[in-house]
Amino acid sequence: MFKDEMRQTPNKPLPIAVVGEAILKQQAIEVRDFDDTLSQLASQMAASMVEAKGVGIAAPQVHSPLALFIMASRPNERYPDAPLMEPLVVVNPQIVLRSLQLEKGEEGCLSVPGQRFTIWRPQTIVVRYQNLAGQWQHSELTGFIARIFQHEFDHLQGITLLERSQMPEQKLMAQEGKPQA
């Protein structure tokens, strides 16, 4: 059904999965085919993200099991102070290194509508991923951009913002008011 919907409307936004839907609990599967279908999915994901005023979206959020997400930080109603970046399609991502320095930030999620949570995350990460052509890329990301990457990466692990906010380390840091070293 998902591929049929993609073929019928190549640039139309896709429906966004919300908390409680099984796809959001599943581990994403590795992308092996870097073809027009993948590019089309990325295009529709981008349209879905823009329509929902997001700064990122993961394939499971549009009912696809693939290990793929898009980051496109830009100031908008939900994130007025977001830095501006060109949209980046991230395929088969890996977080290679996480800094010990943590920072808290407010996050929302297209799959947890109307809610915001304060989440602690590593301030800097080193990542590895493939682009739409299948070429491996390496980057060091900091601040808000690192936060987006980690948030979307969580979706590929079957973790939504709601689950992340309930993890013991989040509760401990909230009680302490500072990151644990």
Curated annotation (Swiss-Prot):
Q: Name the Gene3D superfamilies for this protein.
A: Peptide deformylase (3.90.45.10)
What Gene Ontology terms for biological process does this UniProt record contain? co-translational protein modification; translation
Alphabetical UniProt keywords: Hydrolase, Iron, Metal-binding, Protein biosynthesis
The catalytic site is made up of: E152
Q: Which residues are involved in binding Fe cation?
A: C109, H151, H155
**InterPro entries documented for this protein:** Peptide_deformylase (IPR023635), Peptide_deformylase_sf (IPR036821)
Give the E.C. number(s). Answer: 3.5.1.88
A GO MF label: peptide deformylase activity
Cofactor descriptive note: Binds 1 Fe(2+) ion.
Which reactions are catalysed by this chain?
A: N-terminal N-formyl-L-methionyl-[peptide] + H2O = N-terminal L-methionyl-[peptide] + formate
Residues in a coiled coil are none
Instruction: Name the cofactor(s) required for activity, per the record.
Output: Fe(2+)
UniProt record similarity statement = Belongs to the polypeptide deformylase family.
Function (record text): Removes the formyl group from the N-terminal Met of newly synthesized proteins. Requires at least a dipeptide for an efficient rate of reaction. N-terminal L-methionine is a prerequisite for activity but the enzyme has broad specificity at other positions.
Q: Know the name of this protein?
A: Peptide deformylase 2
